[in-house]
Amino acid sequence: MNKSLNYLRHKNFAIYGLGVTGRSVIRYFDKNGMKNYVLWDDNKKVFKRFLGSKYRRMKSDFLESINFVDYIIVSPGININKTKLKKVLFKNKHKIITDLDLFYLLKPYLKSIVVTGTNGKSTTCKIIEHVLKKNHFKVNIGGNIGSPILNLNSKKNSLIVIEASSFQLAYSKFVKPDYALILNITKDHQDWHGSMNKYIESKFKIFSLQKKNNFAFINSKKLLKRFKKNKYASKLKFVAAEDYKKIKNKIENNYLNSESNQENMSFVYALSKILKIKEKPFIKSLKSFKGLNHRHEIFYKKNNKIFVNDSKATRFEASKFALKNNKNILWIV
């Protein structure tokens, strides 16, 4: 029997937010006999789907229960400082966790890689997954990419690759990755976090939760200074672009050799060395990587013209990486 699951069956939960994440939590609870929960969503149309069913919970029930529950699972993107339930949530802030926390509470035995940063998270996660699978690791991928984390059917010897947003990390308390990567930090989500400093703090939260035998990866001297100042327990791995450049010409993959992927690849290479993947099998595994849809995706070529779909880049900072890689550009926004 899963001792962690049995322990959590006797805890009381409040689920706030019934989007993809909230619904994945409900499914997991129902599947595993976890019946002690109330739920709510500010969006009446979303919440209405649960009325008249076994999930029926009124707002009054939610507000009355929230002071007595053990954990409040908040969906990513919900800012407790701006919600209608601000007062009661702030009072119970110490109880707030995310679906990532729940995953770690349920499966503390799993090894994990958490990738965060402003740009390149999804691509980096997929490259890591690809390299690990090609080198005979048992891998699952989830979080902000692919399936919600609680949907994963992870075996005891699996290595989990998780894409984590600043929203998730801001609330996290039990996420303890063996390997944590902060790819980059540029201005983003300040409307949610309140300031650039708080945004950076949310990213660095991942290092504060690590143990002394875990690894932390960064590539910026500015972030390095912050890491040393905070004296985190984990082992620091500074990602130097020069290390990857030494093998770049051996990699036969135009997608990965693009300027926009150099930072991502530097992290993947640094991680592969810590995981003791040798250089030759590492290079060989990258040959078959095809890239992600809508991320610097070449979908048509004609008369020396190349058509690139980069529609996943919804911010200028993200688009800038793709634009740097090309000349004579007609940029359609």
What are these regions (language model features)?
Residues 1-114, 295-297:
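Short, basic phosphate-binding NTP loop
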Residues 2-12, 24-28, 32, 138, ...:
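Nucleotide phosphate-binding/pyrophosphate-handling subdomain across enzymes
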Residues 19, 42-43, 145, 220-222:
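Residues in the short beta-alpha loop(s) of Rossmann-like NAD(P)-binding domains
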Residues 20, 119-123, 262, 313:
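Residue-level detector of alpha-helix initiation sites
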Residues 27-30, 63-67, 76-216, 224-233, ...:
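Phosphate-binding loop of NTP-binding sites
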Residues 36-42, 216-220, 332-333:
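Short internal beta-strands
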Residues 38-41, 99-102, 233-246, 283-287, ...:
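Beta-strand->loop->alpha-helix junctions that form or flank phosphate-binding loops
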Residues 50-61, 93-96, 110, 157-158, ...:
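Active-site regions of enzymes building and remodeling cell-envelope glycoconjugates
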